[in-house]
Amino acid sequence: MYITPLFFPNLLKLQRKSFLTFLKYGIKKEIKKLDITKNKKKLLVYPNLFQLNLPTYTCNECVITSKTYNCELVIPIRLISYKDEIEWITLTNIPIMTNKCNFITNGSPRVIMSQITRAPGIYYHKENENTYYADIIAERGNWLRIEIDKKNNIWMKVKKVPKVPALMFLQALGVTKSNLIKLLKYPIPNQNHNLGNFKSQKEALEKIELYSQLESSINSRNLKNQNKITIFDRFMNPKYYDLGTRGRIQINKKFNNIEETIQHSTLTSKDFILAVHFLLKIKYKIEETDDIDNLKNKRVKIAGELIQSQFGIGILRLQKYVKDKLGNIKNNLHLTNIFSSTPINTTLAEFFGVNPLSQFMDEVNPLATLTHKRRLSSLGIGGVNRDTATLTIRSIHPTLYGRICPIETPEGKNAGLVNSFALFAEINSEGLIETPFFRVCNGRILYEMGINYLSANQEDKSNIVPFDIKKSRIGFLSKNKIAARIKQQFKEVSKKKVDFISISQLQMLSVATSLIPFMEHNDANRVLMGSNMQRQAVPLLKTECCLVGTGLETKIFFDLQDNVKSPPNGFISYLSLKKITISNIRNEHKSFNFKSNPLETITCIKSKSRNFNRLKYNLKDLLTNSKESLKITNYMSYVREQKIQYYIKQYNSSNQGTCSVNRLTLNEGQFIIKKNPLISGLSSCRNELALGKNLFVGYISWKGYNFEDAIVLNEQLVINNIYTSTHLEKFETEIKKNKENSEIITRDIKNISFLNKKNLDKNGIIKIGSRVFSDDILVGKLLPIETRILSPYRKLLYEILQKQNDHYRNTSLRVPKYKRGRITFVDYIKDKGKIKKKTEILKDLKTIKIHLMQNRLIQIGDKISGRHGNKGVISKILKIQEMPYLNDGIPLDILLNPLGVPSRMNIGQVLECLLGLSCFYLQRRFKVIPFDESFGFEVSRNFIYSNLYFSNIKTGNNWLLHPYYPGKNRIFDSYSGLPFDQPITIGKAYILKLIHLVEEKVHARSTGSYSLVTQQPLKGKSKKGGQRVGEMEVWALEGYGAAYTLHEILTVKSDDIKSRQKVLTSILNSETIKFGTTETFKVLIRELQSLCLNIQFFK
């Protein structure tokens, strides 16, 4: 039994579930912590009665007007001993997750990544041969370390505090020496040092130097008391220290401490004694150390929990703020004066704006968006540091199977620290990642019992076998002896001892990795590159489904919810590019009880047009008495004629500047089923994810143009717009207004020709649909300036040139250099929101936003890639008559270097292109599940050869499968018309165009800023930097003998300060450029002089 995409869980289920838990229980839990008492005044809060008001703006309006999509949290509060009245106070504005599982803050879609950290509890490690230590990790509070060093001394360490003897610390807490020796049971090494000679608790406190940094500020009299209070506060006061429920459970399980209750969230003296006791057990080889990289010792915080912890910090800040207010205000006590939403609002704004886990949503394509929401990071507050993270943290652990994808991770510093959830991964109530298995009993898979989710801890106790072992159709395991996994090791066990089996061969993979066909034939490094590069694929103008897929393309398309779906069954009564109307029959209202609800009292809310697709109708909405209601006399006629309208936005922009064009996929009058997609948008085709194009590929070197991963392309791909992508650029201009002078929006601008103003409307703003080029006016603006008093000479000059004294300066918004395209959107925003009518334009207008859409053809320098990590840059675009062609005259679309396959070990690309060739001639598409070798030996190769053989027979093209060199064909040279000497591999491969476009990379520096330290030009396009001429570039110029060019590059174009200021004057006066001394040379001399070498240089 194979789990098909129909049985896959929703890929965004984890994020939705977490945020809903926060709204239902998290808010209530944090508000309960609000305890405000000051000067006999107490505020009573009712956390169970909190309410969330609906958002003021829709998601679309928030994006346009740069606002945050949030809802108001109100709560009833009563001030005891003042008035008995209950007042509703606005506590904060909570950012709300959209139906696409992202947040909108200040108009920008953002994603909160999940964080994986060490679970709270105690963990034992071995550092060296004779050094052991235990780390006690809390949810809130300092980490504590207890260690035994080489000299058998037991120490206790806290960050930024000197270490103290651990047993002395216990004596300071009140445990006597005799009790310690009894409780520990095992012989204490180096007793004299560890226990000391203290007669009382006071002496132990005096000796401890745990808080030595406070000694200067504390009097000698209060030192004992202060030490005792500080120790208590550090680990035993709930205000400063919290183990959390999970931490307490873990410690109790570790020490078999049944007596300690779960509610006790701080450390006790008994915990310290048991911790030292267990450490001695490890010292004497009775117990084993913990594996901190095991997933049973890590827990995951998803968006809801991260926001909840931040909300809790805001509650503490609010508590402090209100207490200060209560202490200061004596008269006119009013809750609105005491309470403010600012403390919590600023805390949440900090989290969404500054926290590294809150990131701009990656919207290059739907796969990038989905993967970004399923990301799992070890970085951030409470996580690891990327600079100090060791190889063990980054490496693959056996417990990752089915929980975290071992392949998909970034290249570079974040490798192994940022991962993705596996397809079937779930999070339980304790924050542990679980993965599903089928139960096996006596060698038979119990499909009828459903699936069992196991955490890493539960998995250790069971014998588990992979999905791809041999089994019968009804679920009996074939072999008597099977290789099973138990406690992270493989052992051969009897089939009757097998407890669980995986549910799918895709179980260990992430979303992006599972889209790569034949990925099991590739090197893991190349699969990693393929997974990452699919997320960089630009949406194309003409989309096309892949001929060879894996079956998950449809699942991704439906789970993202970017596409408009129909909620009811019905037929399309009206269809246009802007609006779709669906008429349907409301079957659910046929059972309506007319006796208890007379028809005269039934009212229906007037239909309002909405911009969003998640429009839900229920009985409560229909039967609401409101001002905007319409009385219905015939209920059944209303039921039959109900209509739902969708308003479609044709062009959708993204954070990365890509653009999708929404297309209609249905016809007027067509009957549609519930959840049927109505439009095809970003990177989608036939309800599937479509990122690239199927091209005829040939693995042949061509005149050196495809040397080192360079790619040769057919010109027809440019002419036919095969790889043309749409990009949207946003322009914004603010209308400056002040008391003295304000900018004026107008069409009447002097010295501007009619051709430059023809696309402006009567107000001076560009019309939608206009085609604009570089330096064209988008918004005509004039700024009044003071009239200058002209001198007699200037007056005479103005009269001769017939020029008038200007009263205005032209401040119009223009199209930047080298940009052109079509205007798709113009929006007018005033101080208090969006302007709805064009008659209001000149009143209170604050900002104008304009979207410019441009089509970018593929060109030399663009980066393209396959799905197997086979990437390259286009080096040559050949005419169709110059490309090699097949036996039936079809020219190849793309030429790849054959040397790129054996060294990279990504054979999957060859298998894909050969199967794609048979797809083209058989007019079929194939879905190939990764790890298909489970169905038999060499299944992939046999399947491809059999399909090539079928296509050979069906089409009569005997050259498709040659008996002597199967998979290769003879192709013809376009210049001579003769076949090449050797047969080559040709096929159909799915090729992607990546966002690394040459148009955005090419940059030239004329003048720009210099670094203050080195006095050399800065680097980078954004800083208008220069191109670094390094050591090897200098050698190249030396090889050509270009002495003067090299001299100029290393001096006046670099850090010769005095000479570079005189270069322009020398060129204009036709003088010889004089070279001075460079700053680099001066630094070298200073370095040598600092070594006491008397080196001087003379002019």
Curated annotation (Swiss-Prot):
<dbReference type="GO" id="GO:0032549">
    <property type="term" value="F:ribonucleoside binding"/>
</dbReference>
<dbReference type="Pfam" id="PF10385">
    <property type="entry name" value="RNA_pol_Rpb2_45"/>
</dbReference>
<keyword id="KW-0240">DNA-directed RNA polymerase</keyword>
<dbReference type="InterPro" id="IPR019462">
    <property type="entry name" value="DNA-dir_RNA_pol_bsu_external_1"/>
</dbReference>
<comment type="subunit">
    <text>In plastids the minimal PEP RNA polymerase catalytic core is composed of four subunits: alpha, beta, beta', and beta''. When a (nuclear-encoded) sigma factor is associated with the core the holoenzyme is formed, which can initiate transcription.</text>
</comment>
<dbReference type="InterPro" id="IPR015712">
    <property type="entry name" value="DNA-dir_RNA_pol_su2"/>
</dbReference>
<dbReference type="GO" id="GO:0000428">
    <property type="term" value="C:DNA-directed RNA polymerase complex"/>
</dbReference>
<dbReference type="Pfam" id="PF04560">
    <property type="entry name" value="RNA_pol_Rpb2_7"/>
</dbReference>
<dbReference type="InterPro" id="IPR037034">
    <property type="entry name" value="RNA_pol_Rpb2_2_sf"/>
</dbReference>
<dbReference type="GO" id="GO:0003677">
    <property type="term" value="F:DNA binding"/>
</dbReference>
<dbReference type="InterPro" id="IPR042107">
    <property type="entry name" value="DNA-dir_RNA_pol_bsu_ext_1_sf"/>
</dbReference>
<dbReference type="InterPro" id="IPR007641">
    <property type="entry name" value="RNA_pol_Rpb2_7"/>
</dbReference>
<keyword id="KW-0150">Chloroplast</keyword>
<comment type="similarity">
    <text>Belongs to the RNA polymerase beta chain family.</text>
</comment>
<dbReference type="Pfam" id="PF00562">
    <property type="entry name" value="RNA_pol_Rpb2_6"/>
</dbReference>
<dbReference type="InterPro" id="IPR037033">
    <property type="entry name" value="DNA-dir_RNAP_su2_hyb_sf"/>
</dbReference>
<dbReference type="GO" id="GO:0009507">
    <property type="term" value="C:chloroplast"/>
</dbReference>
<dbReference type="GO" id="GO:0005739">
    <property type="term" value="C:mitochondrion"/>
</dbReference>
<keyword id="KW-0934">Plastid</keyword>
<dbReference type="Pfam" id="PF04561">
    <property type="entry name" value="RNA_pol_Rpb2_2"/>
</dbReference>
<dbReference type="InterPro" id="IPR007120">
    <property type="entry name" value="DNA-dir_RNAP_su2_dom"/>
</dbReference>
<keyword id="KW-0808">Transferase</keyword>
<dbReference type="GO" id="GO:0003899">
    <property type="term" value="F:DNA-directed RNA polymerase activity"/>
</dbReference>
<dbReference type="InterPro" id="IPR007642">
    <property type="entry name" value="RNA_pol_Rpb2_2"/>
</dbReference>
<comment type="function">
    <text>DNA-dependent RNA polymerase catalyzes the transcription of DNA into RNA using the four ribonucleoside triphosphates as substrates.</text>
</comment>
<dbReference type="InterPro" id="IPR007121">
    <property type="entry name" value="RNA_pol_bsu_CS"/>
</dbReference>
<keyword id="KW-0548">Nucleotidyltransferase</keyword>
<dbReference type="InterPro" id="IPR007645">
    <property type="entry name" value="RNA_pol_Rpb2_3"/>
</dbReference>
<dbReference type="GO" id="GO:0006351">
    <property type="term" value="P:DNA-templated transcription"/>
</dbReference>
<dbReference type="InterPro" id="IPR010243">
    <property type="entry name" value="RNA_pol_bsu_bac"/>
</dbReference>
<protein>
    <recommendedName>
        <fullName>DNA-directed RNA polymerase subunit beta</fullName>
        <ecNumber>2.7.7.6</ecNumber>
    </recommendedName>
</protein>
<dbReference type="Pfam" id="PF04565">
    <property type="entry name" value="RNA_pol_Rpb2_3"/>
</dbReference>
<keyword id="KW-0804">Transcription</keyword>
